Amino acid sequence: MTITPESVQQLLNSESFGDRLSGLNKLRQLDVKIAFEMLQPLVTDINTRVRYVAVSQFDTLGQQYLDKSLEVLCDRLLYDAEPDVQAAAADALGGLKLAVAFPHLETRYRNTTEWLVQFSIIAALGELGDPRGFDLLKEALSSDNPLIKTAAVSSLGELGDPRAVALLIPFADDPDWQVRYRLIQSLGRLGGEESQEILAKLAQDEVEQVAQEAKLQLIVHR
């Protein structure tokens, strides 16, 4: 069957949430301008899964419409009732590198107890590359949730602030090998003599994946 704006709109207007999901998945096969207009009403759909999928698509369909994407995504981040949708909004804001959204991301981070939302925000801060995110990432390093802590380690590397090196060094002894692995990647990005020393230490790590990644970073950044 040929996919047309009319056929997709029919799916999006269906009372069946399965049809609406199908319509959302077909939007990427349409002209971006048309698809973006058709996408927007679905972010307030009655069905959580439909809203989640709709919000997630802003990462790709919203590239040419950043102002509108910012408006819609911040609204969903702050006011959607479902943590999954809030997290998807944070992911999309990061993917679109909408640094202007930082105050909204910080507000949501501090006003939620949902780990998934906090995790998505911390991951997004690395993609945003906004220096205002440094203090929040520093705070997240002390999270009791290992996934949030690991995301903070990664995002500090992406942010590129050399002050992060001193904060990250203690994680060379973290019992979770995945934290040490992410640490290596971040130290590789941050560079500097202290980073090289830690990478040399981790090149002898008992976990092969960690040791190999450290050796690779030493070669790339020597």
For each of these PLM feature ranges, what is it?
Residues 18-26, 40-41, 48-60, 87-92:
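Non-membrane alpha-helical segments in proteins
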Residues 15-16, 46-47, 81-82, 113-114, ...:
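Short inter-helical turns and helix N-cap capping residues of alpha-solenoid HEAT/ARM repeat scaffolds
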Residues 174-222:
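Long, ordered, amphipathic alpha-helical scaffolds
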